[in-house]
């Protein structure tokens, strides 16, 4: 199989990740629940992974990183734990449903919501953020990179608007963590939500969020913590405040190994390889008659994503043909990005998304281009 669905999850993981998970499953106890070797091993692994993520994102320290199951859980924690009825929030049409649906839920309860629109290339106007601020605005919530077009947002520019108005800035880094340099303090990011199974090259079922010192989030969950057992309420200090119950220690072990691999390989090296593959694919397919490509490719400093359609064919049928006839894995449909599809005019047809990993090859790109040429010629 030629795997071009890396924006959904990276299928190929570094060997060190698999080895770390396997070892943890045979030796790891429950962190904070004992003083035996298994429990202490779990605590060390979890701390070391926190520290590695804190360094990766430029956080103040390991205690600012809390683990979750994925970015959806992290975003729900951030959005529902920070906002309340009467608050006003600014977001964009680029967002995934893991941002939109929690915001819609709060809007139904009395929160005010402004969604900044996107143009036909999937871009937003940055001046709109400043103009959308109201006296009761509490936060700005945006993605870093669109999971449909691959377009990037300028986090530092948006963060400066948030900081100037005393707003909290929540970022969904699902598509960019592990590939693009993110410095939460330089970019004025207050909460950064991430998942481990995409660009971070870790296992599924592990993610997390960075929370800036001074930002308090109402926990979604409370319960076992391993510390301060006699408190009636869940301990308030980070990261314990956001980590009720047993953590996914095995997943954290794999994520820690993945972050080490990323740092040793170099984010620049990984990103440049992915973008080179994307550029080669884009330059070839945009010349095929009957192919429509979505997104802004005026700059190749973007996520390694190319979404397209073949003539007026349903995207699901094209993706199925690529899989069945050519062994190429892609993602069709709406990609949990309804507002972006409306902006692009692809609500009915959807789109076929190709997303690349640095483990992909130039030969795989050539095979995919040839397959699309054949499909575009079919009657």
Predicted region positions:
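Pyridoxal 5′-phosphate
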Residues: 1-379
């Amino acid at each position: 199989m030629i795997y071009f669905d890396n924006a959904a999850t990276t299928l190929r993981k570094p060997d060190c990740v698999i080895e770390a998970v396997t070892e943890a499953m045979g030796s790891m106890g429950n962190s904070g629940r004992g003083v035996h070797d298994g429990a202490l091993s779990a605590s060390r692994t979890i701390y070391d992974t926190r520290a590695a993520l804190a360094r990766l994102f430029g956080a103040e320290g390991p205690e600012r990183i809390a683990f979750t199951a994925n970015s959806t859980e992290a975003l729900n924690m951030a959005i529902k734990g920070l906002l309340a009825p009467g608050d006003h929030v600014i977001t964009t049409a680029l967002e995934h449903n893991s941002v939109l649906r929690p915001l819609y839920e709060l809007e139904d309860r009395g929160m005010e919501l402004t969604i900044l629109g996107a143009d036909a290339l999937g871009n937003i106007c940055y001046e709109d953020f400043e103009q959308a601020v109201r006296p009761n605005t509490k936060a700005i919530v945006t993605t870093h990179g669109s999971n449909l077009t691959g377009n990037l947002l300028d986090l530092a520019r948006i963060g400066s608007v948030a900081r100037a108005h005393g707003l909290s800035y929540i970022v969904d880094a699902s598509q960019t963590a592990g590939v693009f340099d993110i410095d939460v303090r330089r970019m004025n990011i207050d909460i950064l939500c991430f998942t481990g199974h995409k660009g971070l090259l870790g296992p599924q079922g592990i993610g997390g969020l960075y929370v800036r010192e001074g930002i308090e989030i109402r926990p979604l969950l409370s319960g076992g913590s391993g510390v301060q057992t006699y408190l009636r309420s869940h301990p308030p200090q980070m990261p314990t405040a956001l980590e009720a119950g047993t953590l996914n220690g095995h997943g954290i072990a794999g994520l820690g190994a993945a972050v080490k691999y990323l740092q040793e390989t170099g984010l620049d090296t990984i990103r440049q390889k992915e973008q080179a593959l994307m550029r080669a694919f884009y330059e070839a397919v945009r010349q095929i008659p009957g192919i429509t490509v979505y997104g802004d490719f005026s700059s190749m400093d973007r996520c390694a994503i190319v979404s397209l359609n073949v003539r007026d064919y349903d995207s699901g049928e094209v993706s199925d043909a690529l899989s069945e006839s050519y062994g190429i894995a892609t993602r069709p449909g709406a990609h949990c990005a309804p507002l972006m599809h409306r902006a692009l005019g692809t609500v009915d047809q959807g789109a076929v998304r190709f997303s690349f990993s640095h483990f992909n090859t130039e030969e795989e790109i050539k095979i995919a281009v040839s397959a699309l040429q054949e499909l575009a010629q079919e009657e």
